[in-house]
Amino acid sequence: MKHLLTGAMAAAVLAAACACSSNATAGASATAAADSIAPADTLPTVYFIREISPESLLKIYAALGRKAEGKVAVKISTGESKKSNQLDPQLIKPLVDEVNGTLVECCTAYGGSRSTPTTAYQTAVDHGYTAIAPVDIMDSIGSDTLLVKTYRHLPYDLVGSHFLDYDFMVVLSHFKGHQMAGFGGALKNMAIGIASADGKAWVHTAGKTANPAELWNNLPADSIFQESMGEACEAIIDHIGDKVVYINVANNLSVDCDCNGNPAPAELADLGIFASLDPVAVDRACVDAVRQSPDHGKQHLIERMEARRGPHMLDYAEQLGLGRQQYRLVELK
């Protein structure tokens, strides 16, 4: 069964309903004023399921109506350590099987357990991912360049070279906070996650350097980093077109990213699974869900998002034409 909610109605109904749940909370889409701007039938759809389970992932993928075909990449984060909050391999296995996917990841630019192809692959082994599917460290032989058509900071993006080998991508993201981006969802998973190690330095420094050794001495203002991520996403989306779906799992909602090997404990209860064909809409829906949650544990996550100017990435991505922040929310039962 589906329940269609738009605008302020979605926020009010879901917030009230979630208050009755002990293990899942959610908020929803844009304001009533936004509803007056665009009819609901012209808005991108974000599907939502409260229960976080393998069956729910299969259901929400099917609801999107876009079948993964050809050589399929499933973009995840394998996480920095076993203390990190990366998605459980057993949670995602049926979906990965359904799309006959390869789990893909790239090396980090800051040291740690995933800084080389060998250690990045070993991390995937250690965290149980190679037991459920093939794993491809996409920058194991270097980077490829994708041009950015509309930019302030990045004339091009540097992605793991194997990215170009895939016909379709499932961007399967753990939605949570992030110590630099404010929050991490579909857009961050693409902008940083598909970037090679050199590309990560390039995006993080807004085009100042592609040398990971020089990253920390060249960090820009938060708002510029947010725009840089948007431009990296533009290059990726221009390349992949409509051969992509976006699924965000909002659980273990720490203020810290899965790249943190010792993240702060989650204070906000799990929200559910969100999915869309629009990356801006699905991330906006997750941000709205955090804000609208009746759970008082949301406060530190909201503060993290705002302090790092996380919502600016959504504004800029929308300006670049990557998606919309107005959406309709369809809850699946």
Specify the residue positions occupied by each region the protein language model found.
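Bacterial N-terminal signal peptides that target proteins for export
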Residues: 1-8
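Short, low-complexity, disordered segments immediately C-terminal to signal peptides
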Residues: 21-37
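Extended, low-polarity segments enriched in aliphatic/aromatic residues
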Residues: 38-333
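Hydrophobic transmembrane signal anchors and adjacent membrane-proximal interface regions, especially
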Residues: 7, 26-28, 169
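Hydrophobic helical h-region of N-terminal Sec-dependent signal peptides
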Residues: 9-14
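C-terminal motif of bacterial Sec signal peptides marking the signal peptidase cleavage site
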Residues: 16-19
